[in-house]
Amino acid sequence: MASSSLPNLVPPGPHCLRPFTPESLAAIEQRAVEEEARLQRNKQMEIEEPERKPRSDLEAGKNLPLIYGDPPPEVIGIPLEDLDPYYSDKKTFIVLNKGKAIFRFSATPALYLLSPFSIVRRVAIKVLIHALFSMFIMITILTNCVFMTMSNPPSWSKHVEYTFTGIYTFESLIKMLARGFCIDDFTFLRDPWNWLDFSVITMAYVTEFVDLGNISALRTFRVLRALKTITVIPGLKTIVGALIQSVKKLSDVMILTVFCLSVFALVGLQLFMGNLRQKCVRWPPPMNDTNTTWYGNDTWYSNDTWYGNDTWYINDTWNSQESWAGNSTFDWEAYINDEGNFYFLEGSNDALLCGNSSDAGHCPEGYECIKAGRNPNYGYTSYDTFSWAFLALFRLMTQDYWENLFQLTLRAAGKTYMIFFVVIIFLGSFYLINLILAVVAMAYAEQNEATLAEDQEKEEEFQQMLEKYKKHQEELEKAKAAQALESGEEADGDPTHNKDCNGSLDASGEKGPPRPSCSADSAISDAMEELEEAHQKCPPWWYKCAHKVLIWNCCAPWVKFKHIIYLIVMDPFVDLGITICIVLNTLFMAMEHYPMTEHFDNVLSVGNLVFTGIFTAEMVLKLIAMDPYEYFQQGWNIFDSFIVTLSLVELGLANVQGLSVLRSFRLLRVFKLAKSWPTLNMLIKIIGNSVGALGNLTLVLAIIVFIFAVVGMQLFGKSYKECVCKIASDCNLPRWHMNDFFHSFLIVFRILCGEWIETMWDCMEVAGQAMCLTVFLMVMVIGNLVVLNLFLALLLSSFSADSLAASDEDGEMNNLQIAIGRIKWGIGFAKTFLLGLLRGKILSPKEIILSLGEPGGAGENAEESTPEDEKKEPPPEDKELKDNHILNHVGLTDGPRSSIELDHLNFINNPYLTIQVPIASEESDLEMPTEEETDAFSEPEDIKKPLQPLYDGNSSVCSTADYKPPEEDPEEQAEENPEGEQPEECFTEACVKRCPCLYVDISQGRGKMWWTLRRACFKIVEHNWFETFIVFMILLSSGALAFEDIYIEQRRVIRTILEYADKVFTYIFILEMLLKWVAYGFKVYFTNAWCWLDFLIVDVSIISLVANWLGYSELGPIKSLRTLRALRPLRALSRFEGMRVVVNALLGAIPSIMNVLLVCLIFWLIFSIMGVNLFAGKFYYCVNTTTSERFDISVVNNKSESESLMYTGQVRWMNVKVNYDNVGLGYLSLLQVATFKGWMDIMYAAVDSREKEEQPHYEVNLYMYLYFVIFIIFGSFFTLNLFIGVIIDNFNQQKKKFGGKDIFMTEEQKKYYNAMKKLGSKKPQKPIPRPQNKIQGMVYDFVTKQVFDISIMILICLNMVTMMVETDDQSQLKVDILYNINMVFIIIFTGECVLKMFALRHYYFTIGWNIFDFVVVILSIVGLALSDLIQKYFVSPTLFRVIRLARIGRVLRLIRGAKGIRTLLFALMMSLPALFNIGLLLFLVMFIYSIFGMSNFAYVKKESGIDDMFNFETFGNSIICLFEITTSAGWDGLLNPILNSGPPDCDPTLENPGTNVRGDCGNPSIGICFFCSYIIISFLIVVNMYIAIILENFNVATEESSEPLSEDDFEMFYETWEKFDPDATQFIDYSRLSDFVDTLQEPLKIAKPNKIKLITLDLPMVPGDKIHCLDILFALTKEVLGDSGEMDALKQTMEEKFMAANPSKVSYEPITTTLKRKQEEVCAIKIQRAYRRHLLQRSVKQASYMYRHSQDGNDDGAPEKEGLLANTMNKMYGHEKEGDGVQSQGEEEKASTEDAGPTVEPEPTSSSDTALTPSPPPLPPSSSPPQGQTVRPGVKESLV
């Protein structure tokens, strides 16, 4: 019966939990001995067995699996035998606590004293596993943390400290007593988390009893106690696991990053060394106080021969005192280092930098550019040494305040160096930082998959058990019934089976220890009951009580009333009304602003009361209609009631001061929109989902932030207090310091936001460089890069496009759509009725209903009333499902919903019954309904027409792609248009119907001429040259726009040329447009989006041309129209394939990007309104206009006091430019906070704000920081990352749509395919032949050794180090030493180059790396030679620097060695084409915006971010500014001056010399639109596409590198092959095969002894016992990847490919295989043996016969019979020796393989043989005869 099979799967019950006794211990020891013996046996017999693993669901720390039921109370807290079969022969036991958690202990004596049975240890274990114990420890840790945050702890805190130490010591003692110290598994120190405890406690005692000097540094170690929380909270360990995993995975990326940064830092060091110290120094110096005229002498210093000369200030004669006309007191050093002589810009701490090249920054009059003083930012920003350069580049890579570094460098070195920054931002910043993201995301995804798989497995196991159990139960029932029938009495009790408690066999296949029986039935039934109960959250009496109290059905009239209310409240129109109210309410809240009139304020407050009333009424009515019991079952209703209650509370407390924040809760009503707005709903869900997973992560983040905040406070707090004067001129603590916990926390949070460098400078200034760098970079790397990226990875994983595309749940209509459907139906009804009236016949309602369909049903406009999401095309994978779901609605599929169910009501509630299912995703037509469907739903005309897509990559008339008419299938078109050169019709059919005059007969007369003309035009337009010409014109006209800068007025010639050119371009484009109209016809031209774009841009040109003729060119509107010419470059879009691809991808993503954008705006709206509530009108301050200092509140307290001072003239009551005075400005402020640019000023203003119209006071409102912290977490981290999510998702979807190449392969096949793809493209290279010459040969051997390569690598590293040692201002000695070292390196590398060329001869240049080396060597030598020339003759030092960079090329050779780095670079290489396209698009956007910026902001006042170098005056400057903002850096600074709209901020009447433009004011509205749109386009879209591509390719690259066989393995195979096949014949001898496969490296290697293995590979052989390389590689690949039946077809295709690539293989056909060969050998040996035996027997017989013959020779008495026999005997054994010899030799020839004798023709083969082997080609005389021909059919099968 079933009982035999059941033991494996019967779930174990609580009876399996047996106490651990000395007998159990003895049994374990016994099993251990047996296991050891078994392993020994297996080892001797060479039996491999799978490795046993512990069961994952029985790990320590997890809960006892459900299957075991509830453990009885008596087994709780006592040692039990281990349940896991893995530990059956290991000395362990488990203990369960009340929460059913498993604790595993070692059964050896703890601390050598306490056995598992000793009373002390048992007590310790009981304490350790108790829930209260961990609770107590947790509380202790938290209390301890609170004490740690005190910046000035009271005196008694010392004793508290001792208490904590005591508690921790006690905890560790308990653990050691229970577990043992460190010898066995599961002891105290075997758990890494306990190392933490141990070190913390040790440190506590050490610091107490040993005086170690700097205590504060050691005290900081106590902070690690906070990490202990991780051990106590269960979910945290997994997240920390994921973090640690991702850090391991990051190693490659980290190495690559450090390497790249080092290379970049070296480049920076060589290029900009010492540049940042060039300052504007007052020149010439004043001789004495009276003689001031001397340095006011104009002619002297503006003398051009001095100014701008690179080297004059180094000239010693000037520095010597004698040259100063006898004034020997002048001290040059002191003069140039005195800050008083430097030129400072207003409000800046650092002197103005300058440079000596023409495009660098220049000094104002009276100043010269001299290298003096220290570097900017306390001297910490520089490229003077390698370390500072590295820091600068790391900062650049993390994009922190990099605009400052960018501006300083460009000012000092010149604008051309922008290229350096472009490379680093794109390669370093975007690429490397996103690689880190990619790695973290992958690590997280892998971890997730693993857990999911594990759960799945358990689930399946459990299901199987249930199945078995059910069967078992049935069988038992049957047995019982049978028994009852037989015996006639009741069978009592369950029969109990004896079975293994584990319900599973040991992994080794042997049963585990025998255990007492346990009943399967009870176990499962218990488990089932438990599951049932788990689903019910509360005890049963609770439900009874709830039913009584919360369901109101008292009397019949009430129930009736309730029903009526229900019908009203649940009506779709009510929902619509409520939604409209929500929107209106939001509008009302958003209309608050400052300053607001009394009346407006009253209107708003009344409005608020009305809305509160409406929402309260809705809630009350719903409560009545649904009963509280039902009402509170729905999440939305709970949400509503919460908000309504809050609104009412807020009304009650309206006048209480400080509770205005409660008003912000009304904003949550906005979220009610989510009910009817799927995207918002989905987004809230995504955030909800990720908050679950993020809960733990946030905790980890909080712990990290806490730890670092405390560390910072402990380490640096005092220093900030003591050395504050170094960083603050007024010696007050700055806003960012670490003197108390809150400020320390803010600094750490700021670092997490990616802003670390500025606070780090302060810290380094007060507390020393080493400590600050360490702490800050740790926070940066751990917090920002790893944790925040994990955050993003989680978001991405809980995000998926499917949810975006079709999130309308179950396709249920929401009430809004029903309501709107009804309204549309009503309008249709009225329309039909009125039309009827107009036609003079009155239609009855029935007729109208017949024509329209039911209300809300398939009405006229039903198509439009479909919800947005339904129109959107579902992603391919959901397609089937989606189609079904739409058809289900209509009742057209036999889905779960039968058509009958779709009764009349469903029709009414379903306004989108007519949706037709889209066919394939690529087709734009809607599917045509079949006839029955058309009859069923009256289908309006306009829906039946296929929709023409807006953008269509293929059919762009205005692009080079061939034009295909949109309406027809290509096949039809081909039939109608044989040459494909027929123009389409000009007008649509509808036009021709309306105006018959448009119809032209093209068969005769003028019509025919017209047709000929159109065909001619068509030919012209379709010609390639025409297209090329137009592209050229577009580029030229775009280029012309770049010249129209502020200097155009002064350059008359250029201006005139441009004016004429502009006209020419306009005429050309008009001509092009007319040609296309004639050629394509209006219909085609105007149905193409790209053509519309051309049309509009040409229109702009025409209008400005006409205005010029009429003389209106100076009119305002015309001028602003002219700025639209900036859009010209857009026409290039459709003409460049690469850009068009990107644009199409982007356009595809626009719907979902817009969706997310809208949702973000809603999300931000809440924060914006909250900001207006909190800060409107509070940012104003009173300022002294001369010193621009803010008055203290003791002087000026509010606006009126300020105004009373104003008449003195020097006082102004002004506002911060970016503020919260209304919702619009609130949005701008939030954008600045979210991009972390300009957020400081906003935060400072918020923190200082008091009340409306009051003077702010320093940090009076400190906790307003939290508003920003919360916004940054939700508004910035979440919402901005959602953009990345959407874009990446869309990207993947589109890839699925278009690139589904490998969708039709199984996973196995994909692996093979990829391996083969690499394989087929390679063929063995002919190795470079060893030279014949003896000396050359020796050199060759030396050069090709691996040791040689390695030593060169080491030298390259050393060279890198010597380059790093260089510094600015190094001593002459150091310069000489470095020069000599460099010389040595150049000699060595030149030597290497020469040696290689000598040894490899002309083959040297066949290897890419060698060419690279050669170029580097040449450049190094040239650089060395030129450096002397440069010092002698003044060539620009820039050239000199660039030449020195050549040396860095040598470092790049290191990449050859590292495999992991190669993968990453491979990913970069793979993404390059796509990135190039995106770069082009980005440049296009920048180009258009810079033209626009030049025409709008060229004359803006120079302040904050706009100055003499960074402005919109010329095209170059604009591009530089826009490049900066592409990463959103510094856009606040550029926006600030543009926000000046009038005096006193700027002067609208100011004259700008050289032009007739007046004023230096900006245009705030245009400025804000300009910057916000640019940031959204470039930063959010383009940059995120960059990220998406990198993630994508990184995944591909890692997949390739993680595949069992990579490129490298094949490379290695061919490298080894070259040694065995020096002539590249592609064949090797069978005899050498064994050595060959042994020489390979893993995974292809087959180590010796490998003869048998090779035979089983069954390799094909050709005459001469040779084997082809590809066959070997195929076989080895198969060996590594495992065999799969699908291989053969694939192999076939691969072979064909290889044949095509390598013609040499075509010539051979294999005639046998190694396996066959072996079989033949075996046969041959057998035949030989048999034949030898036969010969032996014969010779024995012969001998005996001869002997007898000789005996009986004379005897003639032999009978006749004997004579006959003798004859035969003679024949056989007689004197025919020779013949026998020949015969035997022939036979042996045929069979044997060892002796190769004379060739013999093979015998004819039987048919089965022919099937096995192809017919052989004629054999060359040298080769041995073909084998395998003589083997009888069936031999192969019989022999192995």
Curated annotation (Swiss-Prot):
I repeats lie at residues 113-448. One of its GO terms (biological process) is neuronal action potential. Residues 1-131, 179-192, 234-252, 439-572, 623-636, 677-692, 792-1025, 1076-1089, 1136-1152, 1285-1347, 1396-1407, 1456-1474, 1591-1840 are cytoplasmic. Potently inhibited by tetrodotoxin and saxitoxin. Inhibited by the conotoxin GVIIJ. Residues 1814-1824 have a biased composition (Pro residues). Residues 36-60, 868-884 have a biased composition (Basic and acidic residues). Pore-forming subunit of Nav1.4, a voltage-gated sodium (Nav) channel that directly mediates the depolarizing phase of action potentials in excitable membranes. Navs, also called VGSCs (voltage-gated sodium channels) or VDSCs (voltage-dependent sodium channels), operate by switching between closed and open conformations depending on the voltage difference across the membrane. In the open conformation they allow Na(+) ions to selectively pass through the pore, along their electrochemical gradient. This is Sodium channel protein type 4 subunit alpha.
